[in-house]
């Protein structure tokens, strides 16, 4: 485990900078993952296939226990692993296109297995009707015969003069490399066999140290996929739902964004403009009920979460009332299919309970927009109730308080109040003039009129 911790710590320092977790935090996270059965060994963390299950398990643990330490560490580690993997792929692609390496030796076929025996028969002087080399020469496209020169022995039979295989051309040497571009591995072999490889299909590649073949990453023509999806009908706009060739598929929210938002809530509070800006950015695109409820569980305490659920239900009831009056309401799917209801909007209908994939497939775009907008409005209401802003009129600079701290307290209180945005700046300037220390008040009075109004 120590070796894995050192590797991960080094990657985090490279890609996370000052926010990189300590070796102790990484070790605690690995121990927890092994204890929960998510990793058989610490080195399994390098496998991208294990990342999504780990993210889901740690997110669930953070929501149940209210402890996000391991989730935060995992978010940083996951970001470093993805960055390192992306950098490696980019480097491999560059090396391949520049001719600095790449490719792999093709697995031996029937011809290459027969070739040594045929060459042994030629060395013994046996007559062979058609050698493997000659068959290769017939099959290889656009190969030219290599001219023989006097005094040069043939590399097939060793004869200097009168070589019977003088017109036989040697097959090109295999392109030996380290597999730096595995997604192109096996393309030549499949084309040589006359098979048509569909665009975007995965090609088999050889894993180092293994004789068998394992599936490798695919190169997908996303422009063609987008055209095909556009021709089949309107795409699902839910985020984080990814549209694939087989239909919409759900993917978890990025752990780094969730942990950063949770840290902002703890440091700045719910009413902070920074917190509200991050929440609005995260919910700028429609989300599934599964993601909305789990996100609120992470950033809200038990009591605020209960208040949010009630406020969200009230907002959804408003949507249902509007959809009942208008059969062509967006939540009703423009009159196609059944009308929306509370169970559908909360993700509690048949096929949706605890199933984000089912929600992505069954919910309409208009329902997803209504779900997210209602959740955001409910969050704003809970923020005002859970953290009432202190009266800005009572804030005064203390005897030993710096002006910067006093200004921060005042600005936070004014921005969290119900004052209209146009009135906040004049109120702040007026409080600076009346509530600060006498020497600061003198400086403000002596300032140009553009400062103190």
UniProtKB/Swiss-Prot annotation:
It comes from the Viruses. One of its GO terms (biological process) is viral budding via host ESCRT complex. The keyword Repressor does not apply. Keywords: Host-virus interaction, Viral budding, Viral budding via the host ESCRT complexes, Viral matrix protein, Viral release from host cell, Virion. SUPFAM superfamilies: Retroviral matrix proteins, Retrovirus capsid dimerization domain-like, Retrovirus capsid protein, N-terminal core domain. Pfam families: Gag_p24 (PF00607), Retro_M (PF02813). This is Gag polyprotein. It comes from Avian myelocytomatosis virus HBI.
